[in-house]
Amino acid sequence: MDGVLNFLTNINVIFTLLGYLIGGIPFGYALMKIFYGMDITKIGSGGIGATNVLRTLQSRGVSNAKQMALLILILDLFKGMFAVFLSKLFGLDYSLQWMVAIASILGHCYSPFLNFNGGKGVSTIMGSVVLLIPIESLIGLMVWFFVGKVLKISSLASIVGVGTATILIFFVPYMHIPDSVNILKEVGTQTPMVLIFIFTLIKHVGNIFNLLAGKEKKVL
């Protein structure tokens, strides 16, 4: 009993669970219900992220579709950032901050508030890692938005954006950057970001097949 109690009161366990719960806040679902009376989990792809929200609202001729989708994207991004910020604020070890980041991503994709359904997690991924690897993630964000703006294919932009940040972690740590944002100095491995990228690919398997077949839908 004491072992269980010690486990449940362990600061690292508490913040990992907190990261999961924060990441699990379904902003897309909540805002679509509040403002439009729609259950976004039962429409389109069933995802609660900005892409499915945008497609759903545009298909119904809603004039502020882009603004609502952008709001949801920002909220999903900032919840990941907030979870990691809290872990930094309370002085958690850098490797455990990565655990909190991963927990927030899993929370978004498998929300405890939606029977463990959710979105594909890209906004939350970018938000959660920006305080951990700011150089790599900010460049990844720019690539994500650029590809999305030019090609208007959300899934491709997501994969390329997260992929860019992942590739950069094999180069940026060897530059003259502060140890506090150097994944190799703090963790000793690039594994956390590589796992996140693999998870991104898994969540986009259907989209990848559609891309290869030339059937992936564009976001207008």
UniProtKB/Swiss-Prot annotation:
Listed GO molecular functions?
acyl-phosphate glycerol-3-phosphate acyltransferase activity
- What membrane topology is annotated for this entry? Multi-pass membrane protein
Q: What general EC class does the enzyme of this chain belong to?
A: transferase
What's in the GO CC field? plasma membrane
Cell inner membrane in keyword set: yes
**Alphabetical UniProt keywords:** Cell inner membrane, Cell membrane, Lipid biosynthesis, Lipid metabolism, Membrane, Phospholipid biosynthesis, Phospholipid metabolism, Transferase, Transmembrane, Transmembrane helix
Pathway stated in the Swiss-Prot or TrEMBL entry: Lipid metabolism; phospholipid metabolism
The GO biological-process annotations, alphabetized, read as:
phospholipid biosynthetic process
EC number(s) given by UniProt: 2.3.1.275
Q: Which PANTHER family match?
A: GLYCEROL-3-PHOSPHATE ACYLTRANSFERASE-RELATED (PTHR30309:SF0), INNER MEMBRANE PROTEIN YGIH (PTHR30309)
The UniProt family comment states:
Belongs to the PlsY family.
Its protein name is: Glycerol-3-phosphate acyltransferase
- The organism named in the record is Helicobacter acinonychis (strain Sheeba)
Task: Give the encoding gene's name.
Answer: plsY
